[in-house]
């Protein structure tokens, strides 16, 4: 691993230092990924002091050796101090507290996370345009660019994009410039599964899948050329892309993979058929020596035994597969750092 393109005279020393810190954190992260993270009793005793009390907890230690690190996923109102003092190692947050340019985190705030030993990863949607982002032009509602598609009926203000168009790629690269400048150590790529949407709306899936693979590789090259070769790339969902990755270029490019709703759809269990169809692809990632992150929205926020058992079941199933779980609230808002469930892992 080495620094690339940091020779520019105008690059601030603090930015160069931030890149170096990212490299150190990421190298340490992958070293710990090859060890048993939860074997450290001090870490676990610390976590128990930071989470709420719960009664009748079932010990999940039979699978805890499969857990190499902890990760968290919060896209709204993230508190930098709270995250810095948490036991999560890999942190996925938005580049902005509220999604807008005015709310973006400062370089100093991201630096604070890194100094606390956290690896900050920036969320970015590459398959949809969001009307609250810095790049949005309200004129598009009257005169949409040729790459802008329909609004997502489940997420107001989010619009499908033909991500293979140069105009959209230019927007994403400018977005990545902001993320890199802030000092993030990687990106979390959402809506990579948009290739399936366009395959259902007039395009051949072989084309849409290969164009998404190409885009992810381009994003990786862009970020790593501007920072370092260890810059983390994590796609979310869309693991069927691996079926089109005939020469392994995508798998060689990504640092790991993340999925939502693997074992549960909200608080409802998925069928074995649904689960196994995804696991056979996710295991390709795991078997290549890379991590698999899983976030299921299983926590309904109550202290009932039903909720507890569901959360335990999700954790156990994830650990049994060698995946890294994060228990999220069932409202899917991702507006808080959910920590109480960590007490189940001891």
Swiss-Prot record:
GO terms for cellular component: membrane. Keywords: Membrane, Transmembrane, Transmembrane helix. Pfam families: Glyco_hydro_114. The keyword Transmembrane applies. InterPro entries: Aldolase_TIM, GH114_TIM-barrel, Glycoside_hydrolase_SF, TM1410-rel, TM1410_Glycdase. SUPFAM superfamilies: (Trans)glycosidases. The chain crosses the membrane at residues 16-36. Its main location: membrane. It is a single-pass membrane protein. It is found in: Membrane. This is Uncharacterized protein MJ1477. It comes from Methanocaldococcus jannaschii (strain ATCC 43067 / DSM 2661 / JAL-1 / JCM 10045 / NBRC 100440) (Methanococcus jannaschii).
